[in-house]
Swiss-Prot record:
Biased composition (Basic residues): 380-400
TM region(s), chain numbering: none
Low complexity bias: start-end ranges: 370-379
The protein's name: Minor capsid protein VP2
Organism: KI polyomavirus (isolate Stockholm 60)
Region (DNA-binding): 347-394
Lipidation, N-myristoyl glycine type: 2
GO biological process, one term: viral penetration into host nucleus
Residue ranges of the motif Nuclear localization signal: 359-369
Keyword Iron-sulfur attached: no
UniProt keyword NAD, yes or no: no
Alphabetic keyword roster: Capsid protein, Host endoplasmic reticulum, Host membrane, Host nucleus, Late protein, Lipoprotein, Membrane, Myristate, Viral penetration into host nucleus, Virion, Virus entry into host cell
Length: 400
């Protein structure tokens, strides 16, 4: 990030030799991409071959050599931030733009580049209007003669610096001044011929606070990546069901080992309550998810989703946060929302009988009842014997 420390030099060179650099490169885009530097090299080499010397100011050379490096550095920062944010479901394309820090709340937002304010910084409240450059104005600090420049010279700002970069610090670190305020301070320092103040601000803010910002971003990325594995609703539900089944199984094994009868009322009621709570939670989630967009307004086939996280993505209706839910999560929740199977009571009773046989006292009572005298039992035995005799006789007759 050393090129960021040369921002005051680039701004000053743009003021002094911007028109000359533009005439050499042909366009501002050529300056930003480095084509202007190549054109400068071609002109210099061609003049050397012809034995001539073309006077090119040092300011124009600074613009043609430093701006492409600055653009590459900002693009690298942009790619790093977008790459990290892509892992967690998207990046906000427009961050907060009004975090003045220790500046007055009426700090101007400026142009798209963030360097050209519509009305400047004036603690006395008199205001700074760059349209009227011939009017005498008060300096923002005592002892500083403010000499503003015409509007069109700062209209394009620094090529290659995106808008979100000016507000990135303010979005994640509200207690610090935003990058827009930092660059505004640098610009005011240059306009007031107080170049060293601008260099001091850049050296202090862009070296220390940007490093803090990057550390905070890295921590945020890691925390979000860790939360992805913990916020999976299907995994959470499966874990709860697995824990419930494991607890019930362990309790049943302990009772079997101790020879105690299984109390089916408590596990059944607990299972019913858990199933009811699970069904209600699944129903609420399905109801909420059904009323939310599945595509996130991002013009993709399945949308951008990270297991149902809140994301922000630009689209036809803007970049507001959406909630995207994949279809397979809804399918699993619908299956969980179905009626749970009922416990077969006969199988449970048979299992109880096998585990806990009838006690000896009950066997003795059964034996007494069966040995008690009665006519019905005698007649029943006689009938049984007679039926068997007649049947055997019939069989013999048939054989003869």
């Amino acid at each position: 990030m050393g090129i960021f420390l040369a921002v005051p030099e680039i701004i000053a060179a743009s003021i002094a030799g911007g028109a000359e650099a533009l005439s050499i490169a042909g366009s501002g885009a050529a300056i930003a991409t480095g084509e202007g530097l190549a054109a400068l090299g071609g002109i210099t080499e061609g003049a050397a071959l012809l034995g001539e010397t073309i006077p090119i100011s040092e300011a124009a050379t600074t613009v043609l050599t430093k701006v492409p490096e600055l653009v590459q550095a900002t693009q690298a920062v942009t790619a790093a931030v977008q790459g990290g944010a892509g892992l967690v479901g998207g990046i906000y394309t427009a961050l907060a733009s009004d975090h003045p820090g220790d500046l007055p709340p009426n700090t101007p937002t400026g142009s798209a580049s963030g360097l050209h304010p519509t009305s400047g910084y004036n603690p006395q409240g008199a205001g700074l209007n760059l349209q009227s450059v011939h009017k005498p104005i008060h300096a923002p600090y005592s002892g500083m003669a403010l000499v503003p420049i015409p509007e069109y010279q700062l209209e394009t700002g620094i090529p290659g610096i995106p808008d979100w970069l000016f507000n990135l610090v303010a979005s994640y670190l509200p207690e610090l001044p935003s990058l827009q305020d930092v660059f505004n301070r640098i610009a005011f320092g240059i306009w007031s011929s107080y170049y060293n103040a601008g260099s001091t601000v850049v050296n202090r803010v862009l070296s220390d606070e940007i490093q803090r910002l990057l550390r905070d971003l890295e921590y945020g990325f890691r925390a979000t990546l860790a939360s992805i594995g913990e916020s999976d609703p299907v995994n959470a539900i499966a874990t709860q069901v697995r824990s419930l089944a494991t607890t019930a199984r362990e309790r049943e094994l302990l009772q079997i080992t101790a020879g105690q009868p299984l109390d089916l009322s408590r596990p059944t009621s607990a299972l019913s309550a858990a199933a009811g709570a699970l069904t209600e939670a699944a129903y609420n989630f399905i109801y909420d998810a059904s009323s939310l967009p599945k595509d996130g307004f991002n013009a993709l086939s399945e949308g951008v989703h990270r297991l149902g996280q809140w994301i922000s993505f630009s689209g036809p209706t803007g970049g507001t946060p959406h909630y995207a839910t994949p279809d397979w999560i809804l399918y699993v929740l619908e299956q969980l929302n179905a009626d749970t199977y009922k416990i077969p009571t006969q199988a449970v009773k048979r299992k109880q009988d096998e585990l806990h046989p009838v006690s000896p006292t009950k066997k003795a009572n059964k034996a007494k009842k069966s040995s008690s005298p009665g006519t019905n039992s005698g007649n029943r035995s006689k009938k049984r014997r007679g039926r068997s005799t007649s049947r055997s006789t019939t069989v013999r007759r048939n054989r003869i």
